[in-house]
UniProtKB/Swiss-Prot annotation:
Active-site residue numbers: H117
GO cellular component, one term: cytoplasm
Gene Ontology molecular-function annotations: ATP binding; metal ion binding; nucleoside diphosphate kinase activity
Catalytic activity: a 2'-deoxyribonucleoside 5'-diphosphate + ATP = a 2'-deoxyribonucleoside 5'-triphosphate + ADP; a ribonucleoside 5'-diphosphate + ATP = a ribonucleoside 5'-triphosphate + ADP
Cofactor or coenzyme needed: Mg(2+)
Annotated keywords: ATP-binding, Cytoplasm, Kinase, Magnesium, Metal-binding, Nucleotide metabolism, Nucleotide-binding, Phosphoprotein, Transferase
Pfam family, one: NDK
Subcellular localization, as worded in the UniProt entry: Cytoplasm
Entry's family note: Belongs to the NDK family.
InterPro entries in the cross-refs: NDK-like_dom, NDK-like_dom_sf, Nucleoside_diP_kinase, Nucleoside_diP_kinase_AS
The protein's name in its UniProt record: Nucleoside diphosphate kinase
Function according to Swiss-Prot or TrEMBL: Major role in the synthesis of nucleoside triphosphates other than ATP. The ATP gamma phosphate is transferred to the NDP beta phosphate via a ping-pong mechanism, using a phosphorylated active-site intermediate.
EC number: 2.7.4.6
Amino acid sequence: MAIERTFSMIKPDATKRNLTGAITKMLEDAGLRVVASKRVWMSRREAEGFYAVHKDRPFFGELVEGMTSGPTVVQVLEGEGAILKNREIMGATNPANADEGTIRKVHALSIGENSVHGSDAPETAAQEIKYWFSDTEVVG
């Protein structure tokens, strides 16, 4: 499997509970390396832009409200098969369906407050990384 990069986000429901370190440790323990990281407080415009793919979905307003309710940690992760590995360690979107030991099973509060986001494909990883980071901020 090839070394690749993916985008990862620790959402406000997790940062408010001081889980940034615990979640990052789970990612690193899974063999992923953080090559860029910053803490941001998303504006409404940033949240709407980042989640534009969901703009016509019924949960969009609630999603934007949640993402602008507190600080978020955005990261670029690197490793073998990083996209799939990150998705596996995050667990199912609904924490009730997540496997034991995954981030969402351990830390998520609900399907809406599920603690993390991760890219689902190489194309979205590239777009999401570019949305939050300049080339000089990603240091492998």
